[in-house]
């Protein structure tokens, strides 16, 4: 705002009236690599309003997110749970499903980025690579390293991704070559990981005690809480999933984990516990802004996280 040189956190619907509804669909800022690292400012965490947007440091009250709040209040909260990567959706979901984005140094994935894919730093999903000014490849697609579901399957642990066709492009397994090949052959990886059994299938399996040992749920676009879709919309699916599991036959042996892939552009004042620079696989030369030099890949900023279970 004009003549303001310092902006402190504020309640987003401070005007009252119907502003509580209006702010449900607002955009905080951007969650991509550039703005997040600029706001992070080498650990000072003081550039949110300028490098992102003034909206990013706003907050909501319990009344604005009653379902999410009640679930968190009733069960166990992970107050120091961080996004894996200080960036946007795809890098964090790639890390979620595989444990890495394949950074160029110190990676446990054998082969070059051009051959193996990555390092996944943005939401690119088309075949090929982006390149730095010096010609180094990054965000290469397809990905070719091993995923967590493949390790589960090798260990004899059953798993499935539950999603509808309108999944907002949020199932990252489609970025891996082995899942693409499996889809062409109508193979097991694709059937479990990139097909569309639907959320009703999850509700039915939960009720009947037929869920696999590990289930992943990818929400439809309208229920994702990604602006302009609202927390009150996401509350519906959070509540329905919880009820399905609680009323299901395997409730006494189930842990239901709720979280988000990235911050959506919302600010945080807590500096993440990023590793020392000697850990080469955790740092990277900033491909977007050379003035940042070597910068941490992550962890990024804190995310909501709660575990719903009879044991939590």
Q: Predicted segments — roles?
A:
Residues 1-312:
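N-terminal pro-sequences and low-complexity stem/linker regions of secreted or lumenal proteins
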């Amino acid at each position: 705002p004009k003549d303001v040189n310092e902006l402190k956190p504020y309640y987003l619907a401070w005007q009252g009236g119907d502003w509580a509804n209006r702010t449900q669909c607002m955009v905080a800022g951007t969650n991509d690599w550039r703005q997040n690292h600029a706001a992070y400012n080498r650990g000072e965490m003081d550039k949110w309003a300028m490098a992102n947007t003034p909206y990013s440091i706003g907050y909501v009250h319990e009344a604005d997110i009653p379902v999410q709040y009640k679930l968190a209040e009733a069960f166990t909260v992970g107050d120091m749970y961080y996004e894996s990567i200080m960036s946007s959706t795809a890098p964090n979901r790639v890390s979620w499903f595989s444990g890495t984005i394949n950074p160029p140094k110190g990676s446990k994935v054998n082969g070059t980025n051009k051959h193996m894919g990555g390092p996944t730093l943005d939401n690119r999903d088309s075949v090929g690579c982006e390149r730095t000014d010096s010609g180094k490849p990054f965000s290469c697609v397809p990905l070719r390293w091993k995923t967590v579901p493949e390790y589960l399957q090798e260990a004899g642990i059953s798993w499935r991704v539950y999603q509808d066709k309108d999944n907002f492009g949020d199932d990252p397994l489609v970025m891996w070559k082995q899942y693409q090949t499996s889809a062409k052959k109508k193979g097991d990886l694709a059937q479990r990981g990139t097909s569309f059994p639907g959320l009703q299938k999850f509700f039915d399996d939960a009720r009947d005690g037929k869920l696999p040992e590990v289930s992943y749920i990818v929400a439809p676009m309208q229920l994702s809480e990604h602006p302009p879709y609202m927390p009150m919309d996401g509350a519906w699916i959070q509540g329905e999933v919880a009820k399905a599991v609680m009323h299901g036959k395997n409730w006494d042996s189930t842990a239901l984990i709720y979280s988000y892939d990235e911050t959506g552009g919302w600010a945080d004042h807590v500096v993440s516990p990023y590793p020392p620079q000697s850990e080469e696989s955790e740092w990277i030369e900033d491909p977007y802004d050379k003035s940042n030099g070597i910068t941490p890949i992550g962890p990024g900023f804190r995310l909501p996280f709660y575990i719903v279970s009879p044991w939590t």
